[in-house]
Amino acid sequence: MQHPASGESWLARPPRTAERRLRPWLTDPASLTARIRMRCGMFGVRVLRQSAGALTPDERRLLGLRAGERALLREVLLIADGRPVVFARSVLAQREQRGGWLRLWRGIGSRPLGAALFSDPRIRRQPLACARIGAADARYHLARRALAGAATLPPALWARRSVFRLHGRSLLVSEFFLPAILGLPDDPL
């Protein structure tokens, strides 16, 4: 699905042009947090932001929001052995800020969101989509700023996203893979 305003194309599966070692990261529907933890000695979450904010046009479209409709944003870096490996951005529309999502959102702190999402059997994940996100997308620049010079970004980042549903309400989670992700060991045998 092409979104002309941002230039990215979200796909159900990564194209052949995606680096082979990155494909499992883009397609595994299990917890990204758990996958990273299995491949590093020390794992951490650096919360960059957890507040109301503006959405990109494709985030609004995916969540069925009108321009100007408010949402809570959570932006974090996932850190493996001291190196940022993923920039993640979660979006919760203001109208969805009730019940289970609101309790989860308020109580998450610096814990990984993935651990909470995958531990609640009531939460259902919709299919993953992936895209190559470049400088035309505001989220690329958010990731670059979050790194604060700790790493140089390539011209584009591979990302994946999906919507999680709880009692008919939606939470969008997008994960942008930073170059250091390829420094983690391959899948254990």
UniProtKB/Swiss-Prot annotation:
It is an enzyme of class 4 (lyase). One of its GO terms (biological process) is ubiquinone biosynthetic process. It catalyses: chorismate = 4-hydroxybenzoate + pyruvate. GO terms for molecular function: chorismate lyase activity. InterPro entries: Chorismate--pyruvate_lyase (IPR007440), Chorismate_lyase_/UTRA_dom_sf (IPR028978). Pathway: Cofactor biosynthesis; ubiquinone biosynthesis. Substrate binds at residues 74, 113, 175. GO terms for cellular component: cytosol. Its main location: cytoplasm. Its EC number is 4.1.3.40. Keywords: Cytoplasm, Lyase, Pyruvate, Ubiquinone biosynthesis. It is found in: Cytoplasm. Removes the pyruvyl group from chorismate, with concomitant aromatization of the ring, to provide 4-hydroxybenzoate (4HB) for the ubiquinone pathway. Belongs to the UbiC family. PANTHER family: CHORISMATE PYRUVATE-LYASE. This is Probable chorismate pyruvate-lyase.
